[in-house]
Curated annotation (Swiss-Prot):
One Pfam entry name: p450
Keywords, alphabetical: Heme, Iron, Metal-binding, Oxidoreductase
Naturally occurring in which organism (per UniProt): Pseudoalteromonas luteoviolacea (strain 2ta16)
Entry cofactors: heme
Record: residues binding heme: C437
Role, per record: Cytochrome P450 protein involved in the biosynthesis of polybrominated aromatic organic compounds. In the presence of ferredoxin, ferredoxin reductase and NADH, catalyzes the coupling of bromophenols and bromopyrroles, forming various polybrominated biphenyls and hydroxylated polybrominated diphenyl ethers (OH-BDE). Can also mediate the heterocoupling of 3,5-dibromocatechol. Can also use chlorinated phenolic substrates. 2,3,4-tribromopyrrole could be the physiological substrate.
Superkingdom of origin: Bacteria
GO molecular function, one term: heme binding
Protein family according to the UniProt entry: Belongs to the cytochrome P450 family.
One of the protein's GO biological processes: progesterone metabolic process
Effect of a null allele: Deletion of the gene abolishes formation of the dimeric compounds 3,3',5,5'-tetrabromo-2,2'-biphenyldiol, hexabromo-2,2'-bipyrrole and the hybrid bromophenol-bromopyrrole pentabromopseudilin, whereas the monomers 2,4-dibromophenol, 2,4,6-tribromophenol and 2,3,4-tribromopyrrole can still be produced.
Name of the molecule in the record: Polybrominated aromatic compounds synthase
Length: 491
């Protein structure tokens, strides 16, 4: 995997390993490739294309020093799993150290991260352990509302984002604050707000890494995305903070109405000395955690559903197989629920292939850095080196996937037509290693249930004369550039 092309070396560390380690291929800022890295539109495709030229590990010059890009399953797994104690601190970027994002679990490190993760995980586990039947009822109610709107609009094409995002947000509001959206929440809801965050983060980070004399020019090109990232993230924080304060007014310790109450209890379980020493408290444990539930749960759930419905419409032969399985297992008188999931291997395989092929999580939602000097496949990486982790490259890694650019749901089935655990073990839509998404189980439930119920109720198609468009808007999560489909009721 080492690249022998002539390239500049990383700046010297306090350890003199020049004669012992190979040189990491380096891309200067002023080079054509460096300019593409900073100015190009499709960032996930750019870093992937650079790996074809420089190898699966390379560095890029920035105004704040070199940043190392890791590509391919071997390097990403080595960093995030085998050396998870090294590749696990937040990069020293201003964009990661300001509110509200600095309060997110994803952007913490060390003992602060360990304490936050432990109490957050316990709260999630305790909340969900006895509520799955209720949660399924809540989800089905929201899906029925989506179906009513789509049936009423008739034979017109549409983007499913409005109803899917709105009803998913309402469902999560119920989980977090024990109430569905009311008329006021519906009236102010902006279904596009979360879609701006993935691309806005990438551009906010690149803006910060630009030389000062070029930042104004960069802002002229990408300022709209940067501003919407900031305003929508702050809006999400304000929404969560308002509801946390409202719930706190009548919170009674030991009485649990919703996830918010479990997080109040989690915050109370951390002693004052620990809170002071680690700079952790209600803003992190309650508000930060719920903001991630609302943002990641609502955003990724909606992004995944737009992709999944688009793929159903784009590949009618696969849609027919999904619906045949749903009809045989569920029938007309029931709706797909968690109890049916094990008997729906093709439906699960279709979802898994959608998440792989669209590469929904193209990179972690934050830039990490090395906590100490380390070697990766013989390459020396100094302490404090920021990283770009290219998850997209895993979905296109030819050592893992045959014909990775093709959409083939059957790749996730074994010879007996059952879901292949081996193939599932190669796909990481929720990340891998210590930083793997804490809400993975809940996220998978949301995506599977939404998809299965909507695919059971509707047949989706591309409007006549319209070309299939599977292009993504680049970001830490990949969002469909355009979804324009029709939905015909099946039941």
């Amino acid at each position: 995997m080492k690249n022998t092309d002539t390239a500049e070396a990383l700046p010297q560390s306090k350890l003199n390993l020049d004669e012992l380690t190979p040189t990491i291929p380096h891309i200067s800022f002023d080079s054509e490739d460096g300019q593409q890295f900073f100015w190009g539109e499709d960032f996930h495709l750019i870093i992937e294309s650079l790996s074809k030229k420089y190898g699966d590990i390379y560095s890029v010059e920035t105004a704040k020093g070199p940043i190392v890009a890791l590509n391919g399953y071997q390097y990403v797994r080595e960093a995030l799993v085998a050396q998870n104690d090294v590749f696990n601190v937040r990069a020293d970027y201003e964009i990661l150290q300001i509110a509200p994002q600095k309060h997110f679990l994803e952007l913490e490190a060390g003992e602060q991260w360990q304490v936050h993760r432990k109490v957050f995980a316990n709260a999630m586990r305790e909340y969900f352990s006895t509520r799955w039947d209720q949660i399924e009822t809540w989800m089905t109610t929201e899906v029925n509302d989506i179906a009513a709107v789509w049936k009423a609009q008739g034979d017109v094409s549409f983007d499913p984002n409005r109803e899917v995002s709105l009803k998913l947000a309402s469902f999560l509001h119920k989980v977090m604050f024990d109430d569905r959206f009311g008329e006021f929440e519906v009236s102010i809801f902006d279904e596009k707000s979360l879609s701006w965050l993935p691309n806005g983060f990438i551009n906010s980070t690149r803006h910060e890494l630009m030389p000062t004399d070029l930042q104004e020019r960069y802002y002229q090109q990408y300022g709209d995305a940067i501003e919407k990232f900031s305003s929508n993230l702050n809006g999400l924080d304000q929404y969560v903070s308002f509801n946390v304060n409202r719930r706190k007014e009548d919170y009674v310790a030991g009485e649990y109405r919703d996830l918010c109450d479990y997080l109040f209890a989690a915050n109370d379980s951390v002693d004052d000395a620990t809170k002071a020493g680690l700079n952790i408290g209600e803003k992190e444990i309650v508000v930060g955690s719920l903001t991630q539930v609302a943002g990641a749960g609502g955003g990724v759930g909606a992004f995944a559903m737009r992709w999944a419905l688009l793929y159903l419409a784009a590949f009618p032969e696969y849609q027919a197989r999904v619906q045949k399985e749903l009809d045989e297992v569920v029938g007309d008188d029931e709706v797909p629920l968690n109890k049916h999931k094990a008997d729906l291997p093709y439906t699960q395989a279709f979802i898994a292939e959608v998440l792989r092929h669209c590469s929904i999580t193209s990179m972690p939602a934050a830039n990490y850095a090395t906590s100490k000097d380390t070697l990766l496949d013989g390459y020396f990486i100094p302490e404090g080196t920021p990283l770009v982790i290219n998850n997209y490259s895993i979905t296109r890694d030819e050592t893992l996937w045959e014909n990775p650019d093709e959409f083939i749901p059957e790749r996730f089935l074994d010879d007996n037509g059952e879901l292949s655990k081996k193939q599932q073990g190669k796909a990481f839509p929720f990340g891998l290693g210590q930083r793997r998404c804490l809400g993975e189980l809940f996220g998978k439930y949301i995506i599977h249930t939404l998809f299965a119920q909507l695919a059971h109720k509707f047949e989706f198609s591309i409007p006549e004369g319209k070309q299939v468009n599977l292009k993504a808007i680049s970001g830490v999560f990949l969002v469909p550039e355009e979804v324009d489909i029709k939905a015909k009721s099946r039941l």
